[in-house]
């Protein structure tokens, strides 16, 4: 709240010593209108400071400005004359300035009432907007007569630049403070006191290494508890030593989890700044950080240690993780009446403790080992002894040196059908004796444990913040690790403050509490926390990590200096050979020689460097920058080395980066003899490129380039073309100018000069020639013009099989002028099938996957199908191979359903009945696709199932158009049993049978139809059910049977009940309601998630 607002309540000094905060009174200062600091000499403040540290923390820091808490006072003289805001001098806590702010407060609606405004201000004069600091404080007005009667109120607030003060507008009534009888004012002086406890600030220059000796981990965002877990494992020093000793010399630096863990540990040990973890999570093989959001710290800890343990096998540190974290327990079941006991020994690496309804960790351990009575309906199956009353429990055989305790704060709530967080108070001690929970104790080595780490979560089940409090040396000196910020803290902050539950001072529900604890066995403390020095880190690992750092620093420097440089891409003439497209080369396939050049370096300097690198003297090379023309082509253009030699590279490139240059060189065979490039007169000469087209092979052949005068006639070039192509002289040639894609002009007149024969003659123009041979007419593409037209329409299309997930497909080169049948024919040849047995699908525009199917009579072209793809985007279509011709298939519909075979097993099938047909047609299609039983009726029926219950049987004449699929229901086809083909409607009935366990809405398994007879004993019905389900007698004895109607169930007395068909008929007047059904109440031994639900993926490290 803003301290300028008027308040509606007034606090009386004598009512309480420590008041509770009231929302309408606890306020933030007005940052838009900061209080004016009065300079009147009549009013002044005297500050009295006292160090709030306890004796145990005196050695935390010599520089008290970095302390975590302090008490300071501010005495306001001539208090009765106070008319404006006044601030105390600063008191530094966490190296931030804290001030007391006092002001009189008036109320427009109550002019005769006045109160004292009392606020705590933090870092108000900073210009930064990124800082924040969470603090708790007690604001107090001192009673000079009796300190016990001093009036105080408590605040808790996150201070930041917009809310840099917090407190109370009406801390006390003015009349109460100024009443001499109350003891708050003496000689017109009032003393204000603040005790403040602050967390380490964020967004300021906080040096964790300097103040604690440790550094934090950067927050990647969405990594939740990982930083807390990594710090916990890092300070398990014996584990850290073992991780360093893992051989990783040959590991891939981006995929090796041990190497990534070594890197994080090494940097935590040696860095002065927060350490990044992106390389570690990348080594897990995770593309996103979603895994952190879906799972808990126990799962990550378990899979991470499992991964490292597996990779320690066969090394000098094999067995380290079991040695540190593994304990043993025995699960037992002891029968009461017979001599039968079942024991199962198990290893464990952590213990999950229930905290709901438990006061402390001892009660949770008692609950963990509590004996469960197996009696009544829950008797134990003791084999040949049958069902017996028994006791079930666990006992700890051994406890590990490092004990991980998972506190079950996150639990599933069946009432709300979601996970909730339990914020109840739960106490845990600094020293934990556990001998009483061991089956056998060792007097020489009692199971006494010292608290080493407290992992804490603030927030609710949907999100929050994670920190860890660590006792690094096991000596009771605690630090708080809050991502990148590490700070000293008191033992109370680390332990008592994280019990959870109610805060006695603030009367608000604590959502900050411990969810995992790490204890170390006292006898193993020195071994587990043994010092880790540089001598414990293999030299080759140090060298590798330091080399990584050097390379990263070099790359960082390059990025910082990148704006000073540009790239020059050199393309040599050999890259033009074999090119079958427009222009001189394919930009996506060409291999450049790349130079990193200072933008301000001169052309002459670059040419000199280029000459040395390429191994040609400067008179044997010439530069031709590739210039984009207005018609979309890219051709070489003249660059005058002499005239432009002093110009800068960025100037000549016209800010193009990268800048591509064609490098012309002397023929390497002639270079050794000292040959130089011929002179080129830029005003009178032109450079042309020559290509020869061969209609027989439908291919282009690069024939080099020539210098020729602009006035030269076309006919004068014919001998050069014949020579370059290997034709005999005077061979009749047809010439074309390659103007741009899809525009190739024939040159008709050979007796005119180049500037008249070619359109807008320029350096880099291309002449394409071919033999004038009548046999060319037999070629599919007889002329260069038709070749380039075909090339313009040519497109590579990826065809993927729709039925194969993530199918990479195959590439076919097609013309975008092709129609549907031409495309189908080409693809069918590739697949060695009939074009009529293929169906094609468009690609979805918004995601990579098949879209709507194409009809076989589609009248558009391939260009129409691909028009929504971007120019450089891979073109993709989908197909599926059919078992019937597409003309027949298009008149059918796809119908997914479940087939229940004669072994009472379900399988998903897809049928293709006539889309205008009925259920009878669907059943006939099913007969073709499945195998029917040998001793069955040969007749099929279609059932509709919702929530594992049969809700109806569809008639054979019902139209398929009326059966629309939905995610909530399933269609099942099954063969009608012989005993259900003919039903005596007067005395018999088909009823629905479904499985459930305790709650009738929790159905599961395979429902079925059962024939019952009027008046038959229910034991006969049970025999048919047992035979159908093929269940052993002992298991079937556990089944209970109920008639379920309208969500309510009534259990059947199996020995007395005789079937009454009316019990399974709808109630009169409620014929629209579902029929009653027979429920089989038993435990669901099948996996809890069905094929109809999305499977939740387990957290997994892939590398």
From Swiss-Prot:
Main location class: nucleus
Catalytic activity as recorded in UniProt: Thiol-dependent hydrolysis of ester, thioester, amide, peptide and isopeptide bonds formed by the C-terminal Gly of ubiquitin (a 76-residue protein attached to proteins as an intracellular targeting signal)
Ranges where the MATH domain occurs: 69-196
Segments for region (Interaction with TSPYL5): 1-209
Record's keyword terms, sorted: Acetylation, Biological rhythms, Chromosome, Cytoplasm, Developmental protein, DNA damage, DNA repair, Hydrolase, Isopeptide bond, Nucleus, Phosphoprotein, Protease, Thiol protease, Ubl conjugation, Ubl conjugation pathway
Residue ranges annotated for the USP domain, each copy included: 215-522
Region (Interaction with p53/TP53 and MDM2): 54-209
Single GO MF descriptor: p53 binding
Residue numbers spanned by region Disordered: 1-40
BP terms from Gene Ontology: DNA alkylation repair; monoubiquitinated protein deubiquitination; negative regulation of gene expression via chromosomal CpG island methylation; negative regulation of gluconeogenesis; negative regulation of proteasomal ubiquitin-dependent protein catabolic process; negative regulation of TORC1 signaling; positive regulation of apoptotic process; protein deubiquitination
Biased composition (Acidic residues): 20-32
UniProt name for this protein: Ubiquitin carboxyl-terminal hydrolase 7
Organism annotation: Rattus norvegicus (Rat)
Taxonomic lineage: Eukaryota, Metazoa, Chordata, Craniata, Vertebrata
Gene field: Usp7
């Amino acid at each position: 709240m803003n301290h300028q607002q008027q308040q509606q309540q007034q606090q009386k000094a004598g009512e309480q010593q420590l008041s509770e905060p009231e929302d309408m009174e606890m306020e933030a200062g007005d940052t838009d209108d900061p209080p004016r600091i009065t300079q009147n000499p009549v009013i002044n403040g005297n500050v009295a400071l006292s160090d709030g540290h306890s004796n145990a923390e005196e050695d935390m820091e010599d520089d008290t400005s970095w302390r975590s808490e302090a008490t300071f006072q501010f005495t306001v003289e001539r208090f009765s004359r106070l008319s404006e805001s006044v601030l105390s001098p600063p008191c530094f806590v966490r190296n931030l300035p804290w001030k007391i702010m006092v002001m009189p407060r008036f109320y427009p609606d109550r002019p005769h009432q006045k109160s004292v405004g009392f606020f705590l201000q933090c870092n108000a004069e900073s210009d930064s907007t990124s800082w924040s600091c969470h603090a708790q404080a007690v604001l107090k007005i001192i009673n000079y007569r009796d300190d016990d009667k001093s009036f105080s109120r408590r605040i808790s607030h996150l201070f930041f630049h917009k809310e840099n003060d917090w407190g109370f507008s009406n801390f006390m009534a003015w009349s109460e403070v100024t009443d001499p009888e109350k003891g708050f004012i003496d000689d017109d002086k009032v003393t204000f006191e603040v005790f403040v406890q602050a967390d380490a600030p964020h967004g300021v220059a906080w040096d964790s290494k300097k103040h604690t000796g440790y550094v934090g981990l950067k927050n990647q965002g969405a990594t939740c508890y990982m930083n807390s877990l990594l710090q916990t494992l890092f300070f398990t020093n014996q584990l850290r030593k073992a991780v360093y000793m893992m051989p990783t010399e040959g590991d891939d630096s981006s995929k090796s989890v041990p190497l990534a863990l070594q890197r994080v540990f090494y940097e935590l040990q040696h860095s002065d700044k927060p350490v990044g973890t992106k390389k570690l999570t990348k080594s897990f093989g995770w593309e996103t950080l979603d895994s952190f959001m879906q799972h808990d710290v126990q799962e990550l800890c378990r899979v991470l240690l499992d991964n490292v343990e597996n990779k320690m096998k066969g090394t000098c540190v094999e067995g380290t993780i079991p040695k540190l974290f593994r304990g043993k327990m025995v699960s037992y079941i002891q029968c009461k009446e017979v001599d039968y006991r079942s024991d199962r020994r198990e290893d464990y690496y952590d213990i999950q403790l229930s905290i709901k309804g438990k006061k402390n960790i001892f009660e949770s351990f008692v609950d963990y080992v509590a004996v469960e009575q197996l009696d009544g309906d829950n008797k134990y199956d003791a084999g040949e002894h049958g069902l017996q009353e028994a006791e079930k429990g666990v006992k700890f055989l051994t406890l590990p040196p490092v004990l991980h305790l998972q506190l079950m704060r996150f639990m599933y709530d069946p009432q709300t059908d979601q996970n909730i967080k339990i914020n109840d108070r739960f106490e845990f001690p600094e020293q934990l004796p556990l001998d009483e929970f061991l089956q056998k104790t060792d007097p020489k080595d009692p199971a006494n444990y010292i608290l080493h780490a407290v992992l804490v979560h603030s927030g609710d089940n949907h999100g929050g913040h994670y920190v860890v409090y660590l006792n690094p040396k096991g000596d009771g000196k605690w630090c708080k690790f809050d991502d990148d910020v590490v700070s000293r803290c008191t033992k109370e902050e680390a332990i008592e403050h994280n019990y959870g539950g109610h805060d006695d001072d603030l009367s608000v529900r604590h959502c900050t509490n411990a969810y995992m604890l790490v204890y170390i066995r006292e006898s193993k403390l020195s071994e587990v926390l043994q010092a880790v020095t540089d001598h414990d880190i293999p030299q080759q690992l140090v060298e590798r990590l330091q080399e990584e750092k050097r390379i990263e620093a070099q790359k960082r420097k390059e990025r910082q200096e990148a704006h000073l440089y540009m790239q020059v891409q050199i393309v040599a003439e050999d890259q033009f050979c074999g090119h079958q497209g427009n222009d001189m080369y394919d930009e996506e396939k060409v291999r450049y020689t790349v130079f990193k050049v200072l933008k301000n370096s001169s052309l002459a300097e670059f040419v000199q460097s280029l000459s040395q690198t390429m191994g040609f003297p400067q008179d044997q090379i010439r530069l031709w920058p590739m210039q984009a023309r207005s018609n979309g082509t890219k051709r070489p253009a003249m660059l005058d080395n002499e005239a432009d030699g002093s110009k800068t590279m960025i100037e000549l490139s016209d800010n193009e980066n990268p800048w591509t240059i064609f490098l012309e060189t002397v023929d390497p065979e002639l270079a050794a003899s000292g040959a130089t490039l011929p002179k080129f007169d830029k005003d009178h000469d032109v450079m042309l490129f020559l290509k020869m087209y061969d209609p027989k092979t439908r291919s282009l052949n690069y024939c080099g380039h020539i210098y020729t005068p602009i006035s030269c006639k076309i006919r004068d070039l014919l001998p050069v073309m014949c020579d370059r192509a290997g034709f005999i002289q005077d061979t009749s040639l047809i010439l074309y100018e390659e103007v741009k894609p899809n525009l190739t002009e024939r040159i008709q007149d050979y007796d005119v000069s180049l500037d008249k024969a070619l359109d807008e003659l320029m350096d880099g123009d291309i002449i394409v020639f071919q033999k004038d041979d009548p046999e060319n007419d037999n070629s599919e593409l007889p002329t260069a013009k038709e070749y380039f037209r075909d090339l313009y329409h040519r497109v590579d299309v990826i065809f993927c099989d729709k039925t194969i997930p993530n199918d990479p497909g195959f590439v076919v080169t097609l013309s975008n002028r092709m129609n549907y049948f031409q495309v189908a024919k080409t693809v069918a040849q590739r697949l060695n099938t009939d074009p009529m047995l293929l169906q094609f699908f468009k690609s979805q525009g918004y995601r990579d996957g098949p879209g709507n199917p194409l009809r076989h009579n589609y009248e558009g072209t391939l260009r129409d199908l691909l028009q929504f793809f971007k120019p450089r985007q891979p073109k993709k279509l989908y197909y599926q191979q059919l078992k019937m011709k597409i003309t027949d298939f298009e008149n059918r519909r796809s119908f997914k359903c479940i087939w229940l075979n004669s072994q009472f097993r379900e399988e998903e099938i897809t049928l293709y009945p006539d889309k205008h047909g009925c259920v009878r047609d669907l059943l006939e299609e099913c007969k073709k696709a499945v195998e029917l039983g040998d001793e069955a009726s040969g007749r099929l029926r279609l059932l509709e199932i919702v929530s594992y219950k049969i809700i109806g049987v569809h008639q054979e004449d019902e139209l398929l158009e009326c059966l629309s699929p939905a995610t909530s229901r399933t269609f099942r086809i099954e063969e009608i049993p012989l005993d259900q083909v003919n039903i005596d409607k007067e005395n018999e009935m088909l009823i629905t049978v479904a499985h459930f366990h305790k709650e009738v809405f929790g159905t599961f398994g395979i429902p079925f139809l059962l024939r019952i007879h009027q008046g038959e004993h229910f034991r006969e019905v049970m025999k048919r059910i047992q035979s159908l389900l093929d269940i052993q007698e002992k298991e079937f004895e556990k089944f209970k049977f109920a008639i379920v109607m309208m969500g309510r169930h009534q259990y059947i007395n199996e020995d007395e009940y005789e079937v009454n068909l009316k019990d399974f008929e709808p109630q009169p007047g409620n014929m629209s309601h579902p029929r009653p059904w027979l429920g089989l109440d038993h435990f669901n031994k099948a996996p809890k998630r069905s094929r109809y639900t999305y499977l939740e993926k387990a957290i997994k490290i892939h590398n």
